[in-house]
Design a protein with these regions (language model features):
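Long lumenal/extracellular ectodomains of secretory and single-pass membrane proteins
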Residues: 1-388, 404-555
């Protein structure tokens, strides 16, 4: 069947929906309002329609819209930030911190600033967040009474033990230290005496009783004065406390030399001081120094990795587990010279954890068409990973099926054979349905079996419009098309965005398009003014959440 019977070229320049507006090119798109633009910025880190897996620097030059919105309607701006934080839609907290800094420095409404101060520790939860916020806010203003009071409140409103933990775990970033910030804020009069002791430690370090009598500084190492985490941190740093006995310290707080000792990691595993994702990141390091050379520790870590309740509590995405599996089984990292001989029980445990993590995928409630590019170049590896683009795309499809099993279809696509003519355009379009193969995908199938199946399919060029052409031809109704490719579309002669507009006009006006460039080549397809299209350039651990939130209409 030829598509010329179904495609109506004129629909690109006609309203498919009363809510559409005319763009600068004479076409009709859904207008992106200010709140939607802000939500998109919080998720993507840009005002356009592209999510970059390789994080780009956030600077004051790329937030002109944010400044205008903050000055015009600061209450609405704040409400978007509050909702986005509560819904956890920003994969990188940096974008929310930058937006918060813009709002704080560009509103003249004192009640908005007061609200920010009252909720400051909810947005700025860790020491790293605080350092980032200060870096951003000082791009727009100098230190004044209001900013000093705001930063001071981050320290003075916490419990002594909580503040001590944050000071020790997040000691510096981007050239800032807590000592710097406290000296600039110079306002801790609202702190309790216990909190003031912790603040004195951050500014002056440990001061002995003898030194205190000379300098007038009160802070001492006495357990009655400072929380245990500071005491143990200083003792471990000085070598007077074995890391094995430093029960109050997380692995990030321990001296670098201590992390070269297998017994340190054994103690962390036995105490449960190693969160699930931290364990995934450090499996190679632990193997390289012999942590798993004894049976009991190896069995313990296998048990932790395969504990389904721990997997679900960690909320780790299957793609992240797959990355850990491929990295560990590969026997080397991608930064530095670290290498190891993989332990097969750990490889098997990670394989089991991959499937267990499907339980962490939240449903979108949408009808989805997942299209897997099967061109030969999909064998390329994703950035900083042993995962190939083909493996990553299949894993992503399996995860999405786990979230919406009854409303998701999966197809493999390449450029189809043949062509058809649209007389009104005096053009011939390539891409018959022969380029589409439906795949019986399920989260219960083995990943390697599905990858093997897609490898056997006929390969050709890349035509990212073809999945929508196929759905249009077969009258399949979808809310979203997710196209997983590694290459710029080139084989077809109708643009994917044009095909999306045709599909919207004839089938579903609300249909969304996500084109995921698994290996970033810098190309983009989405119209940045079209709220229903998104490019994902490159693929990393944060990309699945971006895709899911976009399909669900959360930004």
């Amino acid at each position: 069947m030829k598509y010329s019977d179904m495609i109506v070229p004129a629909t690109q320049r006609e309203k498919a929906d009363p809510r559409q507006v005319e763009n600068s090119a004479g076409g009709y798109v859904y207008e992106v309002d200010s709140a939607a633009r802000l939500r998109r910025f919080l998720v993507l880190g840009t005002e356009g329609g592209t999510f970059y897996a390789s994080q780009k620097d956030l600077t004051k030059e790329n937030v002109s819209f944010l400044k205008e919105y903050a000055a015009k309607d600061p209450v609405a701006f704040y409400n978007v930030l509050d909702e986005a934080d509560a819904d956890n839609i920003a994969p990188r907290h940096s974008t929310l911190l930058l937006a918060l800094a813009v709002l704080y420095t560009h509103t003249d409404k004192q009640e908005v600033r007061d609200t920010i101060k009252a909720r400051f520790t909810s947005f700025v939860r860790t020491g790293t967040h605080l350092f980032e916020f200060v870096e951003y806010v000082t791009m727009f203003r100098k230190w004044g009474r209001g900013l000093r009071s705001l930063i001071s409140s981050w320290y003075t409103t916490k419990k002594p033990s909580d503040l001590a933990y944050l000071l020790v775990k997040y000691r510096q970033r981007g050239g800032w230290t807590h000592r710097d910030l406290l000296r600039l804020a110079h306002g801790t009069k609202d702190a309790t005496s216990e909190v003031r002791n912790v603040i004195d430690y951050a500014v002056h370090g440990i001061v002995t009783i003898e030194d205190a009598s000379k300098t007038g500084k009160f802070t001492t190492v006495n357990d009655d004065v400072l929380p245990e985490v500071i005491t143990q941190f200083e003792q471990a740093k000085a070598g007077t406390l074995s890391p094995v006995d430093a029960t109050a310290l997380s692995w990030e707080m321990l001296p670098t030399e201590a992390l070269k000792d297998p017994l340190t990691w054994v103690a962390l595993i036995q105490r449960g001081n190693l969160p699930y994702t931290a364990m995934l990141r450090n499996l190679g390091r632990m193997t390289s120094i012999g942590v798993f050379s004894d049976g009991p520790t190896l069995r313990a870590v296998v048990s932790l990795l395969t504990d389904e309740s721990r997997v679900l509590r960690s909320r780790v995405h299957p793609f992240n587990v797959l990355t850990a599996l491929k990295t560990y089984s590969g026997g080397h990292g991608f930064r530095g010279s670290l290498s190891w001989t993989p332990k097969q029980p750990i490889v098997d445990a990670l394989d089991a954890a991959f499937y267990a993590a499907f339980g962490n995928v939240e449903p979108t409630g949408k009808r989805i068409n997942i299209a897997l590019d099967i061109s030969g170049s999909m064998g390329a590896r994703l950035m900083d990973s042993n995962v190939t683009a083909r493996e990553g795309s299949v894993a992503m499809a399996m995860a999405m099926l786990a979230g919406d099993p009854l409303t998701t279809d999966t197809v493999a696509f390449t450029s189809g054979a043949g062509s058809w003519t649209v007389p009104s355009l005096r053009q011939r379009f390539a891409g018959y349905p022969s380029g589409i193969t439906e795949i019986g995908l399920s989260p219960r199938r083995r990943l390697d079996d599905v990858v093997r199946e897609t490898n056997l399919l006929r390969m050709g060029g890349t035509d990212c419009a073809l999945p929508m052409l196929w759905a249009h031809s077969n009258k399949r109704v979808y809310d979203a098309f997710v196209i997983l490719t590694d290459n710029e579309t080139w084989a077809g002669s109708i643009q994917p965005m044009d095909m999306l507009r045709t599909y919207r006009a004839d089938v579903n006006p609300e249909a969304r398009l996500i084109v995921v460039g698994m290996t970033s080549t810098g190309f983009t397809i989405a119209d940045p003014q079209d709220k229903g299209s998104l490019d994902v350039t490159g693929f990393d651990a944060s990309a699945p959440a971006v895709i899911s939130n976009f399909i669900a209409g959360r930004f």
